[in-house]
């Protein structure tokens, strides 16, 4: 009983931490894109600025895909934790 109850509780905590990580990663990427656009808009000129901005924007798109994958993983972990919780509640009540 204790093992199953501990496992699903740990899964919930892990999923919560992973979700917080995804949120922080998304925030930092948006901040990076914003700061890059500000710098390239005012300080840099020409092809170098365009190339750097394009690189950051491509990286942002890739990171958004990774963040979405993390969120899907969080959903799957939460679903498994709920399954374990239901099993624990049925077996040990």
Q: Would you name each region that the model predicts?
A:
Residues 1-93:
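N-terminal secretion-targeting helices of virulence/extracellular proteins
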């Amino acid at each position: 009983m204790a093992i199953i109850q501990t496992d699903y509780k740990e899964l919930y905590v892990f999923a919560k931490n992973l979700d917080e990580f995804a949120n922080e990663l998304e925030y930092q990427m948006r901040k990076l894109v914003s700061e890059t656009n500000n710098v390239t808009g005012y300080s840099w000129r020409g092809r170098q600025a365009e190339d750097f901005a394009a690189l950051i924007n491509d990286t942002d798109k890739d990171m958004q895909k990774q963040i979405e994958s993390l969120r899907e993983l969080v959903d799957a972990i939460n679903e498994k934790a709920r399954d374990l919780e239901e099993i624990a509640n049925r077996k040990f009540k």
